[in-house]
């Protein structure tokens, strides 16, 4: 998926973060004093806005795509504490030891290696600052398809997508080792079922899938293949609605340690 293409505007905006996500993240921040947070790879600003809703005084959304930042600007216009900056995760537009919290949600699977990004995270975080990574492992991705886990049908309908997904997903062991080698202490790791959307009817889910909205993996399918996938999901889901679509994620909560 080309995140810079104007045809993909609003692909990663237009919804709110799940209440369970807000509660989970807030609980991990409860013992920390967070003045400045940065949402790296902020896309359309959904989680930039969520960090502000938690009560963080200053939130910086960073993305390399001007189109995504334009979407984020619209989504975050009511939040005075949000600032948006254009930049790459391997060369963050943040001063050294300037940030108390870095969030990287749905980012690292777009990277060939996490090492340059984790080095930048270590540079920009204050000592004791928190680094929250949210992404899917292969175990998360390849759960069977169901009414809630619609994504599972992608891989049963088109097994070649499994190979594409396998190339871009890092194992939990890899993430843990990369955190350790860059001076982070892993505080907590957990899986999180996050509600993606509540579709009033099956037809609305199928329309959403047809738009490929927020699902970069579907850009690997031709229009004809996408139509086939939509048909497979249509025939697989018996209930008409409402459909509560969820994704399972892995969360890694790490703390920057003092200089070794």
Model features per residue range: what roles?
Residues 106-107:
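Short catalytic micro-motifs in class I SAM-dependent methyltransferases
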Residues 44, 169-173, 186-260:
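Conserved Class I S-adenosyl-L-methionine
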Residues 115-127:
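A short glycine-rich, Lys/Arg-flanked "PGG" loop and its adjoining helix->strand segment in the class I
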Residues 38, 44-91:
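Class I SAM-dependent methyltransferase SAM/SAH-binding core
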Residues 103:
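A conserved beta-strand element that flanks and buttresses the S-adenosyl-L-methionine
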Residues 1-32, 38, 46-50, 68-71, 132-158, ...:
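Conserved class I S-adenosyl-L-methionine
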